[in-house]
Structures are given as structure tokens and as C-alpha cells.
């Protein structure tokens, strides 16, 4: 453990005068080590104990990983500047999630003083613009993870700067940065071959070319989230490689069964697949998928309106690990499909969450079948108007820990205590 | 069970939010009395751009959203709250809570903060307040929020949609006034809005608006005879009409289907004092120029050499006399309505004040006092105050117009004897206006 040289003299001076045993018994290195296990709040408290402790607690080595989210979010730029001066090269990980008043100026200071930062989270720092990313690209070549979720001023320029300066990047999140387009993504894909996770929810300009680049240049890509990129077609999705584990293409309304078939052949290890609002998908695609992707655990099929019980039959047979299945607004699903699902190998052990809201054909019968799903913890039944209160009560009797989400008014417990009160007031009794 | 309850409530809040954000033309909200739900059906209804919430869930939803807001939105400065809501959840909760109970100023203030932080859009705020007002048309907080929004909006922005903005604002006032009789908040909002526009839109447009509002208030007044808030607004409109330019006055006269001069002459002819020989016939009076008519009615020469704007003076008298006949008509139709009698007081007060003003007098502690001419600022200090006042006062009381008005009032009070307000009106004129000796 080392601490900044400029403080060594001061520590020697203060420790001589201290009466406290702990300071005498333990060497400074050990104290520093102990302090390094504390969180932000405790460190700040320790810093108020004595001059010695102040120096120790605020030593940069204790501040390698900082997350201000639970501590304080209305921080001003000066706080970040202080942090970056104190931590210097020690800082590895910084989360400024939700610190909305942070702007470019202080982020530039940070990039200059903390060149070793590896993980930076700027989620919802709405004032951050391309200048921050340019500074990061110039200084912080070790950056591996960057989260720019909901920073609307971030554009392709940022992605280019980051790809030029940070070749080690593995995780990138640019969700809701609406100006991001194919050019930025292509630059990133070309110069960051180690990329494992790319998330760009709601970036409407991300198109087939962008995703194709990611698929060809980043062979390790495991996580891809292109929710709401409605320009995407089967062309790019079919190019995704075998490393893919978690894929979210919700809201990519142009996708058809071709994508599903391609995923089935190329990405057999898929664990999570979100396909909400892909309304063109049919049973045929899911048949192919269920045959080869046997590791699937989570599937979101909300508003895949064309799928029928056949899909459920295939999923039940092909995906024994299925934990979470959302079938909201799949209006053709009937009790038969649920019955098949409940008889599958996944049902008894794995299935924990099942979303059936707005499936108008689901009736009380479905709930009776689900009794065999011992692990079921949550079932969503909003707006399934054929499901009655009695059926839910029966299901609860069999699965006491289940949570049922439906539009039934919660039963209010009868008001207790009204009848138990003595009819006469206490004073009358005494007299 | 509590988890499920919370999930249900949050789902309902989300449903409401979905309807609010997806339906742009939403114009009404209400709570639908459905006490029990046998079917697993959403309590949030959206039919023909109206949002409804079934009553069985209101209590739970309100409890949840209110406590959530109070615990987590940092309203108590003492208690340092750990969890802070993000702006979207905060907005969702604010929407639902305020729709159910709009009388929470704290929450409205939170919304204002959000507008200042650009987390909320001003136009969506206008829509939301409108929705709130559709259920609670008397909610002052919603009106004041609207005023705040409009104030910042009108001050800071170059406005492209001013016309539609004015229209929607007036429509909102119409709807709220219509839904709830005697809606003071609605009418004072309308009044504030017109006053606010004075600094913003061009004079011509403003005059057109004054005329429109005058006509509107007349229609409204004759349908809502005991809504004094409306009468108050009418008085505001009349005062605005005083300031019309010549051009606008022409369009104003053309827009009406009555001739002001004829109404005035008719009133005069019916109540000419008997003891005097009137040379002018009705036709003559109609064709008189404004100046001549005023000379005939007031027969007064100002002591100083200033020119009196007899045209505008004549217009004011015409306007007020029309108002007086209108009021008499309404009173004959709808008896025993206090607010109309109060409106009559206003009219007479205006007429009498105007005459005092013309004669260079004003009432101070119930006594007439001579004031300096407002144009040339000369005071005749040589003559004694008392003497001048006596002579001017005599002039005033002998003028045709004054006698006509007094006679007309006497007649009207006799006519509506059975109305107890008539007696009060007489007392008002005698004691408050100091016409005891003359009636």
C-alpha cells in the first residue's frame, strides 16, 4: 500500500502527537488497508476523526471504486474535480449515474487526472457532450466499460474519439443517444475488437450496416441490445456470431422468421432473447429456434401477435432451461398451449416468471395446469378477463409463495378492534 | 400480498401514464363509480378522448402514490431522503395524484420545479391542467399553475400559435365556468388572461378581442343571471370598451344588431322631465352629432378652455344606457336576483361618476369637492370653493341626463316594488350615492 508522497511528512508529524492507541499500535499501511474496505459514506465520516485519519481516509488508494448513486446525486462539477485530484491514477471505476448537473468541464479534468480509469458510468448525465468523450479518448487508454445511457448530446463524434483512444473497450452503452448512427458504430466495431457488450436502446439511426459491422469485427460480442432500432432487418441479425448470449431486438418490427432461423443455426448458446413487438414472427421461426437453442432461459415475446399454441409446444420441448417467459398481448394463446408448457421439463424445475397479461383466451383452466410448475413465483394476468378470482385462490393454495398480478382489488382485511372495545369507557368502569 | 397490491397499483399508475402520453387530444378525466370488479379488467378507461378511472382502485392508488411522493420526492427538508425518484416515475406519480386530488399545492410546486429544469414541457402542462379542471373546475391550484405556465411562456417565447393559445385558454374558461356556476376562479383567470395579453398582442387585435369578449359576456350574462363572477367580468369588458379606437368602435357598432343611439334616445324620450319644454324630437336626437347631444344633455360649459372629448363621452353614456336597459329587461324577466341588482348599482355608479367627472367634481367623504381641470391643471382659486360647488352641483342636477336617469330609476323601483332588492337599491342611491334630496 502506498500513499501520496506529499503527505508523508504530515503523517509523521501528526502520528507523533496522537494519543490514540489504534494509531500507535497499527502502522499506517494497515490503517490504510482497513480504510480501503469502507464505502463512501464511512470514509467521509472517518475523514472527520482526526487530521491523521483525514489524510488516510482521503488518500487516493481508498477511492479506486466510487459510486455516488446511493450517496448523493445533486453533485456539482467541483465535487468531481476534487475527486479526480485526490484519486489521480488510483481511480479505476467511477459511477456518476444520475448526477444530472455534471458537465464537460469537470469531466475533462477527470480525464486528465485519472488516466487509469477502466469503468465509467455516466448514465443520465444529460449535460455531458462529445467533448467529454474526446477528452477520455485522448487520455484514458485503459477504459474498458463506458455507459453513456441517456446522454442526448452524445453523437458519432464521441464513438469515434473513444474508438481511436480506447482499444480495450469491452462494454459500451449508448442507449437513447438518438444521434448515434452507423458511422459511429462502424468506427467502434473496427477499432475495438474485444467488444463484448453493445447496448443502443432507442437509437433510431442504428441500421443494418452498423449491426453487420459489429457482427463481423467483434467476434466476441455476447450482448447486443438494439431495442427500438426499427430500421433493422433480417440481413444484419442473420450475421450475428456464435458468441452471442443475450440479444434484445424488441421493437425491431421488420424482423421475420428468417432472423429466427439464422439465430437458430448461428447462435446455439443464446440465453436471453427479447422479441417484443416483432409482430411478423410466426410459429415456424420459433420451431427452428427451439430445436437448436436449448440454453434459452429468458424469452420476451410480448406482442408477437401471430404466434399460437404451436410455439409453446416447441418451446416446451426444446428449451428445458426456460425460466422467464413473457407472452403479453399474444392473443392467440389458449389454455392448450399453457397445458403443454406446464407439462414440459422446464416447467417443473425452472419456470419462475410467466407473463400472460392481455391474453384474452386464457381461462381458469390454464391456471389449473400451472399448478404443476412448482417453481413459479410470479404470474401476470392483467386483463385476462376469463380468469376468475376463485381460480387464482386455488392456484395460491397449491403454490403458496406465488405472486399473482391481476386487476382484482386487493382484499382488505376486516377492520379489527371495532368490536373488541369495551362498551363503557374506562373511567366508568373504575367508578 | 402487499407486494401484489403494490404491483397492481403500480400497474394502474403505469396504465394511466400510458393513456396520458399516448392520447394527445385527451380533454376530460373523471372517476367512474364502479365499486366492485368481478372481472379481471383494467380500471383505466379511455373512451373518445376521455380518461376514466374506476372508483374501486382510487383509494389504493392515491394512498400509494401520495405516500411514495411524500417519502421520496424530498418534500421534507428535515428528513434526508435516501431514495430519490427519477424524473419519469416522479412525473407518473404526480400525474395520478393530482388527477385524483388536485388541491395539493406542494405537488404543483414540484411540477413547476420540473418545468424550470426543462423536465416538463409547457404545452403538456397546459393540457394536463385542462384535464384536471375538467373534473374539478373550481381548482384554484390548477388555475394558478396555468397562470404561472402562461406567464413564463408568454414572457419568454416568440409565440407562433398565439391565436390557438388564446382560443384554448378562453375555451378552458368557458368550460369551467359552464361546469360550475359562480366559478370565481374561472372568471378571474379569464380576466387575468385578457389583462396579460394587453402587453403582448397588437392593439388592433386586442380591440377585436375586447369586442368579442363584450359580446360573449352579454350572452353569458343573460343565461346566468345570478353569477356575479360573470357580472364582474362584464364590468371589466365594459371598461375595456371605453378605450376602443374610432375604427374599432365602428366595427363594434356594426357587430351589434342594436343601435346604441336609438336605445339612449328611447330611454331619454320616455323619461323627459315634464316641467321643461324640450325642443328636440326623437328624430332630431338620433341625428344629433355627439357634441350637440352632449351639450343638450349636460348643458355645461367648463370653466377652463380645455376641449372635452365629447365623442368618447357620448359613447360611454350610450354604452352604459344600453347596459341599463338590458339590466332592466333581465330584471323584469328574472325577479329577485341579487347579483343583477348589484350590477345595476355598478352601472349607475359609473354614470354618476362620469357626470361628476365632466363637471369637474368628485365626491370626497360624501361631499362634493371641486377638482382642478385634469387637462390644463388650472384651479380657480379666486372664487370660493363652496360657491363653485353649489353652482356646478346645481348645473349637474339640473342637466337633462341626470334628471332622466333619476326619473328612470324612480319608475323602475316603483315598478318592481314586490322585490325587496328594489327597496335596497333605492336606499343605495339615496344614501351611498348621496341623492337623498333629489329622489
Task: Identify the residue ranges that each predicted region occupies.
Chain A
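Eukaryotic tandem repeat interaction scaffolds
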Residues: 223-358
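A structural signal for leucine-rich repeat
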Residues: 81-85, 107-113, 133-139, 159-165, ...
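N-terminal adaptor-interaction module of cullin-RING ubiquitin ligase components
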Residues: 1-111, 115-116, 124, 129, ...
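C-terminal interaction modules of eukaryotic adaptor/scaffold proteins
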Residues: 366-431
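Inter-repeat linker/turn residues at the boundaries of leucine-rich repeats
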Residues: 51, 61, 89, 112-115, ...
Amino acid at each position: 500500500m502506498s500513499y501520496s508522497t506529499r503527505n508523508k511528512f504530515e503523517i509523521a508529524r501528526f502520528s507523533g502527537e496522537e494519543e490514540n492507541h489504534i494509531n500507535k499500535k497499527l502502522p499506517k499501511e494497515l490503517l490504510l488497508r482497513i480504510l480501503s474496505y469502507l464505502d463512501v459514506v464511512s470514509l467521509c465520516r472517518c475523514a472527520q476523526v482526526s487530521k491523521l485519519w483525514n489524510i488516510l481516509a482521503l488518500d487516493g488508494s481508498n477511492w479506486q471504486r466510487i459510486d455516488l448513486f446511493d450517496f448523493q446525486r445533486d453533485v456539482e462539477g467541483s465535487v468531481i474535480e476534487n475527486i479526480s485530484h485526490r484519486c489521480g491514477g488510483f481511480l479505476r471505476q467511477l459511477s456518476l449515474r444520475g448526477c444530472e448537473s455534471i458537465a464537460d468541464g469537470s469531466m475533462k479534468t477527470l480525464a486528465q487526472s485519472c488516466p487509469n480509469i477502466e469503468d465509467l458510468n455516466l448514465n443520465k448525465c444529460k449535460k455531458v457532450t462529445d467533448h467529454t468523450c474526446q477528452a477520455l479518448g485522448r487520455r484514458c487508454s485503459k477504459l474498458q466499460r463506458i455507459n453513456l445511457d441517456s446522454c442526448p448530446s452524445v453523437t458519432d463524434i464521441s464513438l469515434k474519439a473513444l474508438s481511436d483512444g480506447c482499444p480495450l473497450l469491452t462494454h459500451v452503452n449508448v442507449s437513447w443517444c438518438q444521434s448515434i448512427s452507423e458511422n459511429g458504430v462502424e468506427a467502434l466495431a473496427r477499432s475495438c475488437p474485444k467488444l463484448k457488450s453493445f447496448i443502443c436502446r432507442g437509437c433510431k439511426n442504428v441500421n443494418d450496416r452498423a449491426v453487420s459491422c459489429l457482427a463481423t469485427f467483434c467476434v466476441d460480442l455476447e450482448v447486443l441490445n438494439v431495442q427500438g432500432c426499427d430500421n433493422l432487418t433480417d440481413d444484419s441479425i442473420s450475421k450475428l456470431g456464435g458468441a452471442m448470449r443475450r440479444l434484445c431486438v424488441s421493437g425491431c418490427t421488420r424482423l421475420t422468421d428468417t432472423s429466427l432461423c439464422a439465430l437458430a443455426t448461428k447462435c446455439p448458446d443464446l440465453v436471453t432473447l427479447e422479441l417484443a413487438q416483432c409482430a411478423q414472427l410466426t410459429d415456424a421461426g420459433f420451431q427452428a429456434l427451439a430445436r437448436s437453442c436449448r440454453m434459452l432461459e429468458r424469452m420476451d415475446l410480448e406482442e408477437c401477435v401471430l404466434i399460437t399454441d404451436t410455439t409453446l409446444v416447441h418451446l416446451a420441448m426444446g428449451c428445458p432451461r426456460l425460466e422467464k417467459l413473457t407472452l403479453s398481448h399474444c392473443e392467440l394463446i389458449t389454455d392448450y398451449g399453457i397445458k403443454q408448457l406446464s407439462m414440459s421439463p422446464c416447467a417443473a424445475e425452472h419456470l419462475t416468471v410467466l407473463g400472460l397479461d392481455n391474453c384474452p383466451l386464457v381461462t381458469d383452466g390454464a391456471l389449473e395446469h400451472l399448478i404443476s410448475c412448482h417453481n413459479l413465483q410470479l404470474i401476470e394476468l392483467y386483463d385476462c378477463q376469463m380468469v376468475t378470482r376463485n381460480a387464482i385462490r386455488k392456484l395460491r393454495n397449491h403454490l403458496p409463495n406465488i405472486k399473482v398480478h391481476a386487476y382484482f382489488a386487493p382484499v382488505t382485511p376486516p377492520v379489527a378492534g371495532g368490536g373488541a372495545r369495551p362498551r363503557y369507557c374506562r373511567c366508568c368502569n373504575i367508578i | 400480498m402487499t407486494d401484489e397490491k403494490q404491483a397492481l397499483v403500480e400497474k394502474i399508475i403505469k396504465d394511466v401514464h400510458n393513456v396520458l402520453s399516448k392520447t394527445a387530444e385527451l380533454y376530460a378525466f373523471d372517476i367512474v363509480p364502479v365499486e366492485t370488479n368481478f372481472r379481471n379488467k383494467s380500471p383505466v378507461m379511455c373512451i373518445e378522448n376521455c380518461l376514466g378511472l374506476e372508483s374501486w382502485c382510487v383509494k389504493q392508488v392515491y394512498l400509494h402514490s401520495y405516500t411514495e411522493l411524500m417519502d421520496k420526492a424530498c418534500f421534507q427538508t428535515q428528513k434526508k431522503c435516501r431514495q430519490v425518484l427519477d424524473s419519469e416515475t416522479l412525473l407518473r406519480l404526480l400525474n395520478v395524484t393530482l388527477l385524483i386530488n388536485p388541491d395539493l399545492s406542494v405537488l404543483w410546486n414540484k411540477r413547476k420545479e420540473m418545468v424550470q429544469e426543462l423536465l416538463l414541457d409547457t404545452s403538456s402542462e397546459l393540457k394536463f391542467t385542462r384535464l384536471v379542471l375538467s373534473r374539478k373546475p373550481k381548482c384554484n391550484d390548477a388555475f394558478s399553475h396555468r397562470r404561472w405556465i402562461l406567464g413564463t411562456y408568454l414572457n419568454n417565447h416568440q409565440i407562433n400559435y398565439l391565436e390557438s393559445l388564446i382560443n384554448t385558454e378562453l375555451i378552458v374558461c368557458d368550460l369551467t365556468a359552464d361546469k360550475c356556476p359562480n366559478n370565481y376562479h374561472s372568471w378571474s383567470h379569464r380576466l387575468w388572461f385578457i389583462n396579460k395579453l394587453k402587453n403582448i398582442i397588437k392593439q388592433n387585435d386586442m380591440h377585436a378581442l375586447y369586442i368579442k369578449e363584450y359580446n360573449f359576456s352579454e350572452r353569458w350574462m343573460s343565461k346566468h343571471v345570478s353569477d356575479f363572477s360573470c357580472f364582474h367580468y362584464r364590468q371589466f369588458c365594459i371598461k375595456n370598451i371605453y378605450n376602443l379606437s374610432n375604427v374599432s368602435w365602428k366595427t363594434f357598432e356594426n357587430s351589434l344588431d342594436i343601435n346604441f343611439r336609438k336605445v339612449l334616445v328611447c330611454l331619454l324620450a320616455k323619461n323627459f322631465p315634464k316641467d321643461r319644454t324640450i325642443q328636440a324630437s326623437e328624430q332630431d336626437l338620433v341625428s344629433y352629432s355627439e357634441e350637440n347631444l352632449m351639450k343638450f344633455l349636460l348643458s355645461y360649459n367648463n370653466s377652463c378652455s380645455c376641449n372635452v372629448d365629447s365623442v368618447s363621452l357620448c359613447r360611454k353614456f350610450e354604452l352604459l344606457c344600453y347596459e341599463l336597459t338590458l339590466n332592466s329587461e333581465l330584471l323584469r324577466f328574472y325577479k329577485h336576483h341579487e347579483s343583477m341588482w348589484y350590477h345595476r348599482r355598478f352601472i349607475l355608479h359609473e354614470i354618476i361618476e362620469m357626470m361628476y367627472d365632466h363637471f369637474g367634481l368628485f365626491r370626497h367623504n360624501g361631499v362634493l369637492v371641486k377638482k382642478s381641470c385634469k387637462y390644463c391643471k388650472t384651479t380657480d382659486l379666486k372664487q370660493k370653493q363652496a360657491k363653485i360647488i353649489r353652482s356646478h352641483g346645481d348645473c349637474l342636477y339640473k342637466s337633462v341626463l341626470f334628471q332622466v336617469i333619476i326619473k328612470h330609476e324612480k319608475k323602475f323601483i316603483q315598478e318592481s316594488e314586490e322585490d325587496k332588492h328594489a327597496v335596497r337599491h333605492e336606499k343605495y342611491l339615496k344614501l351611498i350615492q348621496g341623492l337623498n334630496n333629489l329622489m
